[in-house]
């Protein structure tokens, strides 16, 4: 009797060990590779999550580099503009900035608008009579700030989408794994751990992968939303000062 009990315990331990091995990531991948026809949905879910993760990390890196660059450029460019002795030298300095530097582009748009309005002044029924210099420069600055603010949003929609949908994509894999477990129970006529370990493991792994993809995307979206808001506020402050400068001809700093 004791011997039978020991054999049963040993068999139970072996079954439990086999079940645990079937619930691992390596076993899931090996099963998906060896039986691709049975795991079409699993492959679609897994590849979708991998693509979503790759795209979200790509835009996270891009936004980190862009935020770091803008943080260093903001004070340097604006200070250089106001510290330059005259407007012509300040404009020339802005023209020497990199093409993707937003603060210099805003300043150049304001300068071009002021120069264009000045040339149009005095013409019969021309621009100078339709809009004042202040209104014309203000319109140009609004357009410039809107353009540069929009450029900051690159990848933000994707990060928000990944953060919101990746868990549900993982849940699709979870549901499919549970469905597979039920099918296996029906086929074998028993609900032993050996019968359902593989599908249940797949379900849990897909849930974990979905969360692994979504959580960094959510953190990145929230972080860059805050940093972009701070940068846009700097755009607005610089634009207001530029408006006063080009509309009146007097420095505000």
PLM regions and their residue ranges:
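Helix-termination/interfacial motifs at the ends of transmembrane alpha-helices
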Residues: 13-32, 37, 152-225
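Hydrophobic membrane-targeting segments
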Residues: 2-79
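Alpha-helical transmembrane segments of multi-pass membrane proteins
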Residues: 58-69, 215-227
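Predominantly long cytosolic amphipathic alpha-helical stalk/bundle segments
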Residues: 71-169, 180-192, 219-253
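Short, flexible segments with low predicted structural confidence
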Residues: 49-52, 62-63, 123, 206, ...
